């Protein structure tokens, strides 16, 4: 069994004082660790979704890799203003972050989805993504992150790396 924490670096007081940033880049750089992480993440999901929904931007990496390995398509949740709204159907949700606020958007559709992101911190992004998927017509069957930094003790997010628990 691989210890994924060996592939995570910490940066203290980034992006602002009091925040400990967990850098997943070393894991992504190692083909064995990355492929094992994708395998283990996918094995946490009992039923294959219609789509893996990646949250901008590193969620795109994991959603794409999971779709390639386990099947299904990829949908993207983008930061506001990054998607064209040519047919005026774009949906958006605003929410608070650990160190600010943001708005995310996606195109509507249907099907079962697993929402995927790299890091789970306060839960704000994942909760907003779930609301956004549901209001856009999707059925959220699961939520998945590579890493839980341990701020929110109780949640229903599946992860393979946990800190603070």
Predicted regions, residues:
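Acidic, divalent-metal-coordinating active-site segment for phosphoryl/phosphodiester hydrolysis
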Residues: 117-130
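Short, glycine/charge-rich flexible loops or terminal/linker lids adjacent to PRPP-binding catalytic cores
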Residues: 72-114
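PRPP-dependent phosphoribosyltransferase catalytic core
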Residues: 6-7, 127-165
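Short loop/helix-cap segments at secondary-structure boundaries that form the rim of catalytic
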Residues: 68, 85-87, 151-156
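Short Gly/Thr/Asp-enriched flexible loops that form oxyanion-binding sites at enzyme active sites
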Residues: 61-70, 129-130
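Active-site-facing substrate-recognition patch
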Residues: 1-48
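Conserved acidic residues
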Residues: 50, 111, 141
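Short glycine-rich phosphate-binding loop at a beta-alpha junction
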Residues: 48-56
